[in-house]
Amino acid sequence: MGNIHIQTKSKEYDVHVGKEALSHLTMIVQNMQPAVSNVMIISDEAVASLHLQTVIDALQVEQDVFSFVVPSGEKEKSFENFYAAHTSALENKLDRNSLILALGGGMIGDLAGFVAASFMRGIRFVQVPTTLLAHDSAVGGKVAINHPLGKNMIGAFHQPEAVVYHTPFLQSLPKKEWRSGYAEVIKHALIGDVELYHWLKEEVQTLADLRDEKLIHILTKAIPVKANVVSQDETEKGVRAHLNFGHTLGHALEKELGYGNITHGDGVAVGMLFAIFLSEQVYKVNLAYEDMKQWFLKYGYPKMPRDLNVERLVQLMKQDKKANAGAIHMVLMQEYGVVNVVSISDETVHIALEAFQKDMV
């Protein structure tokens, strides 16, 4: 069992990680001041069928507990479900002392968090992540829904009261979701914990190694990387953008291929490889791109699709939240553990993407 303390300018809270983390949930709710009036659990159909009753049973409180369940999938992080959640909250008489509990992966955490941020101008919420990917999204307070023209374009910064990372919930994940979440673990290692990066290369030979004590070790090492960045820059005015390493191309791939047709982590993995590929050219350094590519492929991460239109990807990358005055800004790597946000011309990105696409045969 491991506890990680998160400190930001707006709030302090704990991340409870381990096989018995769910046992903390009742005390977390009971200790809140002012007292919680009622609880609304937001989940998706897949997670609810597996874990909703377990959480309700663990939540031994006197307050009324309601649930709002949406279909599964990234495309459900929509305005329609956001609006429907508000309707459910009003129908169940939630008020400013109510608590929203986000039970699910990153999609649910984002959706439920944004509902909490906006309902009556902001009420409290707790994250109960059920995926490895959510070790990233559940911490830091970024909550959002998607717009047809871009991912996470409508949202807010709203920190949770706590994060309860009950690792047994992860055991039901399909292989593609383990791989997706592991990409964000790799990202945290590359940008902020080089020792963790070397440990991963030695200790995680296959995705099946992401279990038991190794899993808890990974979570208690990767989450503090994000916590450290968020403590310095809660609202992404500076160094927090470093957490977007791999995301400029990754988000473009998700948008171009269609949400749900490529997992977030697979997109980020391709994006990280491209960022390393481009970083070697921009900084004139050797980042062992070829070794990194083989390491990623060993885990089953996809190659850059050969049939995608490069110019279309460039235009999508210009819609990224880091873009400024229509110019692409990417997180590039000077060396392992040292990254910077860099403005890159469309032409440079286009040429590099074409070369990267050909290299990923």
UniProtKB/Swiss-Prot annotation:
Annotated keywords: Amino-acid biosynthesis, Aromatic amino acid biosynthesis, Cobalt, Cytoplasm, Lyase, Metal-binding, NAD, Nucleotide-binding, Zinc
An example Gene Ontology biological process: amino acid biosynthetic process
Residues binding NAD(+), per UniProt: S72, G73, E74, K75, E76, K77, T130, T131, K142, K151
Primary location class: cytoplasm
Binding site for Zn(2+): E184, H247, H264
Enzyme class: lyase
Keyword Phosphoprotein applies: no
Pathway: Metabolic intermediate biosynthesis; chorismate biosynthesis; chorismate from D-erythrose 4-phosphate and phosphoenolpyruvate: step 2/7
Gene Ontology MF terms: 3-dehydroquinate synthase activity; metal ion binding; nucleotide binding
Cystine pairings recorded for this chain: none
Reactions that this protein is recorded to catalyse: 7-phospho-2-dehydro-3-deoxy-D-arabino-heptonate = 3-dehydroquinate + phosphate
Gene Ontology cellular component terms for the protein in this record: cytoplasm
Known cofactor(s): Co(2+); Zn(2+); NAD(+)
EC number: 4.2.3.4
Cellular localisation: Cytoplasm
Record's function text: Catalyzes the conversion of 3-deoxy-D-arabino-heptulosonate 7-phosphate (DAHP) to dehydroquinate (DHQ).
Family: Belongs to the sugar phosphate cyclases superfamily. Dehydroquinate synthase family.
PANTHER family given in the database record: 3-DEHYDROQUINATE SYNTHASE (PTHR43622), 3-DEHYDROQUINATE SYNTHASE, CHLOROPLASTIC (PTHR43622:SF7)
Name assigned to this protein: 3-dehydroquinate synthase
Organism the protein comes from: Bacillus cereus (strain G9842)
Gene: aroB
